[in-house]
Amino acid sequence: MNSLLMITACLVLIGTVWAKDGYLVEKTGCKKTCYKLGENDFCNRECKWKHIGGSYGYCYGFGCYCEGLPDSTQTWPLPNKTCGKK
């Protein structure tokens, strides 16, 4: 039983370490904007959407910042795409 608990704890820890953090990005290449800095329901909801897959989100530097994102989620800055330019 103790071994099972240790294995489970290690898997949870590994998942946390391998998760990435970053700003949500719009199709334009800009950060997803927010205005209420700190704890922010909008950013938290956006980060936790199924297609985003984050564990927590808040407003930092007027952009939605997400923690615990899978590697497949794009974060700002996008390579070869400048905010607002084509």
UniProtKB/Swiss-Prot annotation:
Q: Where in the cell is it found?
A: Secreted
User: Could you name the domain of life of the organism this protein comes from?
Assistant: Eukaryota
User: GO cellular component terms?
Assistant: extracellular region
The record's tissue-specificity note reads: Expressed by the venom gland.
- Disulfide bond among the record's keywords? yes
Task: Provide the leader sequence positions.
Answer: 1-19
Q: Which residues carry this modification: Cysteine amide?
A: 83
Q: Which GO terms of type biological process are on file?
A: defense response
Keywords, ordered alphabetically: Amidation, Disulfide bond, Ion channel impairing toxin, Neurotoxin, Secreted, Signal, Toxin, Voltage-gated sodium channel impairing toxin
GO molecular-function term, one example from the UniProt record: toxin activity
Domain (LCN-type CS-alpha/beta) spans 20-84
Listed disulfide bonds for this chain?
Answer: 30-83, 34-59, 43-64, 47-66
Q: Hey, which family's this protein in?
A: Belongs to the long (4 C-C) scorpion toxin superfamily. Sodium channel inhibitor family. Beta subfamily.
Function statement: Beta toxins bind voltage-independently at site-4 of sodium channels (Nav) and shift the voltage of activation toward more negative potentials thereby affecting sodium channel activation and promoting spontaneous and repetitive firing. Affects channels from chicken and frog.
Domain text from the record?
Has the structural arrangement of an alpha-helix connected to antiparallel beta-sheets by disulfide bonds (CS-alpha/beta).
The name this protein carries in UniProt is: Beta-toxin CsEI
